[in-house]
């Protein structure tokens, strides 16, 4: 569980203008809509587990800078890797992230998601603090999202 919290807490989300039709440009609203879409997908009893996983993967791939998150996870080791090793790592990290995300989030399909606050770090970067409230014996998960807005003027 600690790995999930660490992974989610350090996730880099990028607001992409191509997603502007679906998600709001306000970082707090964007994160709220994104998380609520994921919870809605996971709690849909008429959808198979495989389809739920594919839908969550799609949301993640469209909104998470997986490569940047992978490089962040590598730390200074990334500087020692050869290009082919880095390419293989990026491929495997994406598979790992998506599998972990879909399997762990399925336990929170009936949970409540709340945005608690946000702090604008720069014109393009905002930290959004949120919580997924656990049900029964599940612990709450505190998540800090780093939202990067490509074009804040729009």
Predicted regions and their residues:
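Surface-exposed, charged secondary-structure patches
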Residues: 99-144
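Boundary at the C-terminal end of the N-terminal hydrophobic targeting segment
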Residues: 18-24
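Bacterial N-terminal signal peptides
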Residues: 7-16
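Short beta-turn/strand-loop junction motif enriched in small, turn-promoting residues
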Residues: 44, 132-135, 147-150
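Early exported N-terminus immediately downstream of N-terminal targeting peptides
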Residues: 24-101
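Positively charged n-region of N-terminal signal peptides that target proteins for export
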Residues: 1-4
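Short beta-strand edge/turn micro-motifs at domain boundaries
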Residues: 140-154
């Amino acid at each position: 569980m600690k790995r999930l919290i660490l992974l989610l807490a350090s996730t880099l989300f990028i607001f992409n203008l191509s997603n502007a039709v679906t998600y709001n440009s306000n970082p707090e609203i964007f994160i709220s809509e994104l998380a609520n879409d994921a919870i809605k997908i996971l709690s849909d009893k008429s959808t198979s587990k495989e389809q739920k996983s594919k839908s969550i993967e799609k949301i993640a791939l469209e909104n998470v800078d997986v490569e940047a998150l992978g490089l962040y996870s590598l730390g200074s080791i990334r500087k020692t890797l050869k290009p082919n090793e880095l390419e293989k790592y990026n491929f495997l990290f994406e598979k790992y992230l998506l599998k972990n995300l879909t399997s762990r989030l399925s336990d929170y399909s009936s949970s409540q998601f709340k945005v608690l606050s946000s702090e604008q770090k720069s014109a393009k970067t905002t930290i959004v603090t949120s919580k997924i409230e656990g049900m029964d014996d599940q612990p709450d998960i505190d998540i800090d999202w780093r939202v990067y807005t490509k074009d804040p003027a729009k």
